[in-house]
From Swiss-Prot:
This is SWR1-complex protein 4. Signal peptide: none annotated. GO terms for cellular component: NuA4 histone acetyltransferase complex; Swr1 complex. It holds the Pfam family SANT_DAMP1_like. GO terms for biological process: chromatin remodeling; DNA repair; negative regulation of transcription by RNA polymerase II. The lineage of its organism: Eukaryota, Fungi, Dikarya, Ascomycota, Pezizomycotina. The keyword Transmembrane helix does not apply. Belongs to the SWC4 family. The gene is crc-1.
Length: 733
């Protein structure tokens, strides 16, 4: 705030008593009065209004006047030489006078004026006379007419008259036909009656006039220049005039006249008919093409060879694969250059010659349409493998679950045989990605692609790609795979994945086996070649470990079956011996009882009827005791069988668990332990009959003791046999 403002607020007088200077007055400019849309547009500008260009009220731009003197025009006479009247008609028109006229009175000026007067007296030719082009009609002599142009319906005079009219009216045929009035000449001499003879003129149509003129022109054109020396336009004109047909021209005009006279309904109907005809023609053409293709496929040379080899399923499958290979090799264009200078056509011929006669005859069938691009065989390797191993080849296309089964079934064999193939031929290059792994052991047999058919279409043919050698593929890093992975991976990670799919015991065995071969488990420099060879070695080692495991499993099963067989034989032998001893004991007891009775009878010598009754009662009681003892033995035997079954269920775990291999991963030690347990059980069961025999020899007469020995023996045999049978069933599952 300044002192002046403070004084003003406090109403104090200023230091300077003089009047305050007045502000500069602003000039009030008239604001444009906008209305309607212009005002709305102006308001959109806000603080920065849009600049509006003022309207200019100028009606017409001022004319630029030249300061040169005005040009002079003069009325001059002219004639038209195209009329052919030698300048009889003289016309006049205004023409601009040329500049540079001399106005002084010198001699040169007088001479130029005199020349101008002379030129003014003689009218000039019209500038449009140069556009008058005369038609050149054929010219001929008397001899040429008599030789080439004679016609029974035309005379030479009438032909000359026609050519004159054509020349005068520039081949405008409607005018020529309208002005054509030929009157034949009267014959010389007088008739016997003294009357004049007036020959009648023949009526001529426009087509007759055209036909005669074109005939004369074509023949004279051929006389002046033979057809073999004519240029292409000249020969086309010659052919057109020579083949002019007056009847066809009349029909064309009549058809055009009728077309112009038809109604709108007839025009629409005719248009619909034309569309239907086009549709029918297109359908007929397509049908003819398909029928021609079918005929070409069915038309094949008859085979004279024996067809017995194709009556079996294997022969038919082999023939199918051969035909597929030949068909694909014909349809697929080769992407590789011919090797050793052998053209693809010669290679295809050699491949067809190598086929069986019947297959070659079928393969020689023509193909429609002719394929410009031929494909290589996609199933050559699978066919070769099927022929080498006498197995039915894989069907094309393979089913998914069949592919998985064949892959799991031939995994071990494919690894070992792939190792041989890699070692002998380096990296295997596959021509097809659809080859199934069911027959990976065989090396692929590439079928050379035949030469592509000559491409008659316009445009240059694409060059074929050159095939790289093995060294070039190694240099450029080119490789071929059965299938591509999900993404980029490191080679050592790829090797680690091989270990991750195995159990700990199998990993330990594989590692020990590799250490025996002086090969580290982790590669130091895993290049592509080293990794491939390591995968081959890994496959061979895995196959060897699996075979060892299967061998141990089979050995354990053999030992178990032998122990079961020995136990069955021992049990049968002991049962037979026990039956023989029982019969002998029963016979001895009966003999002893009979002898005692005789002695008593002898000692009694005359005993009464009471003693006899007592003795008979005692014998009856002895028989009842024997029967009771037999019943008790049978009952005890049934109880032994029931107890044996209970002990068998309880002992299954003890006998079956050592035999199981823990998911297929335990080795020889578990099988040996199972065999040892079986032998111990057999020995313990075999000791039971010995104890029984010792008890019998010591005079043990108690039936319970004898039955207990037999019970223990039968129990051990039944438990071992039943447990072994159930363990065998579980192993089979």
């Amino acid at each position: 705030m300044t002192s002046h403002d403070v004084r003003d607020v406090l109403n104090l007088p200023s230091d300077h008593a003089g009047p305050r200077p007045s502000k500069k007055a602003r000039t009030a400019t008239p604001r444009p009065n906008l209305k309607g849309l212009a005002r709305e547009v102006q308001n959109l500008g806000g603080d920065n209004p849009i600049a509006i260009v003022p309207e200019v009220s100028i009606f017409k731009k001022r004319r630029t006047v030249s300061r040169k003197p005005a040009a002079k025009w003069e009325l001059k006479a002219f004639t038209n030489s195209a009329r052919g009247d030698d300048g009889a008609l003289v016309l006049r028109h205004w023409k601009r006078k040329p500049d540079g006229t001399v106005q002084d009175g010198s001699a040169e000026g007088q001479d130029s004026a005199a020349t101008a007067d002379n030129s003014a007296d003689k009218p000039e030719d019209s500038s449009f006379a140069k556009f008058n082009v005369r038609v050149s009609v054929p010219q001929y002599s008397e001899d040429q007419y008599n030789t080439n142009l004679k016609h029974p319906d035309w005379t030479k005079e009438e032909t000359d008259y026609l050519l004159e009219l054509a020349k005068d009216f520039d081949l405008r045929w409607p005018i020529i036909w309208d002005r054509y009035e030929y009157a034949p000449q009267q014959p010389e001499g007088e008739t016997p009656d003294g009357m004049a003879v007036v020959p009648a003129s023949k009526p001529r149509t426009m087509e007759d006039l055209k036909a005669r003129y074109y005939e004369v022109a074509a023949k004279m054109m051929a006389v002046q220049k033979p057809a073999q020396y004519m240029t292409r336009p000249e020969f086309e004109l010659y052919e057109m005039m020579l083949h002019f047909d007056p009847k066809q021209e009349q029909n064309r005009k009549r058809f055009a006249e009728n077309t112009l006279k038809r109604s709108s309904d007839e025009a629409r109907e005719e248009e619909a008919l034309l569309l239907e005809i086009k549709r029918i023609m297109a359908r007929t053409e397509r049908f003819n093409e398909e029928r021609r293709e079918l005929y070409n496929r069915l038309d094949y040379p008859a085979s004279e060879s024996d067809i017995n080899s194709f009556k079996t399923s294997a022969g038919l499958q082999s023939l199918l694969q051969t035909l597929l290979n030949v068909d694909k090799s014909k349809k697929r264009k080769s992407i590789m250059a011919p090797e050793n200078g052998v053209p693809p056509a010669a290679a295809a011929a050699a491949a067809t010659a190598a086929l069986p006669p019947a297959a070659a005859a079928v393969a020689a069938a023509p193909e429609v349409p002719p394929a410009a691009s031929r494909r290589e065989s996609l199933a050559a390797s699978s066919t070769a493998g099927a022929n080498d191993h006498h197995e039915p080849p894989v069907r094309e296309p393979p089913v998914r679950h069949e592919r998985q089964e064949s892959r799991s079934h031939h995994r071990n064999e494919s690894r070992s045989e792939r190792a041989d193939r890699h070692g002998a031929h380096g990296h295997h290059h596959r021509d097809s990605v659809s080859q199934t792994p069911a027959t990976p052991a065989e090396a692929p047999t590439p079928v050379p692609a035949p030469a592509p058919a000559a491409n008659k279409k316009k445009g240059p043919q694409q060059p074929e790609r050159r095939k790289l050698s093995e060294h070039e593929e190694q240099v450029y890093g080119v490789s071929h795979h059965d299938r591509l992975g999900s993404g980029p991976t490191f080679r050592y990670e790829k090797i680690n994945k091989l270990y991750s799919h195995k159990s700990g015991q199998q990993q330990m065995r594989i590692t020990n086996l590799l250490l025996e071969l002086d090969i580290p488990a982790r590669l130091i420099m895993p290049t592509a070649a080293v990794t491939a060879q390591f995968e081959v070695l890994w496959g061979a080692v895995t196959t060897l470990v699996d075979l060892r495991k299967m061998s141990d499993k089979v050995d354990a099963e053999i030992k178990l079956e032998e122990a079961k067989k020995a136990e069955r034989e021992r049990a049968a032998r002991e049962a037979a011996e026990a039956r023989g001893e029982t019969v002998e004991k029963k016979g001895g007891e009966e003999e002893g009882e009979g002898g005692g009775a005789d002695d008593k009878q002898k000692d009694g010598g005359g005993a009464g009827g009471d003693d006899a009754k007592d003795k008979s009662g005692e014998s009856a009681q002895a028989d009842e005791q024997k029967n009771d003892q037999k019943a008790e033995d049978a009952k005890a035997q049934k109880e032994q069988q029931g107890e044996g079954q209970d002990q068998q269920k309880k002992g299954e775990e003890g006998l079956v668990v050592p035999i199981k291999e823990g998911g297929g991963e335990k080795g020889q030690g578990d099988a040996a332990a199972a065999a040892t347990a079986a032998e111990k059980e057999a020995e313990s069961s075999s000791n039971q009959p010995k104890i029984k025999e010792e008890a019998d020899e010591n005079g043990s007469s108690s039936g319970a003791g004898a039955s207990s020995g037999a019970r223990q023996h039968k129990r051990s045999a039944s438990v071992l046999s039943n447990a072994s049978d159930k363990s065998t069933k579980k192993q089979k599952k």
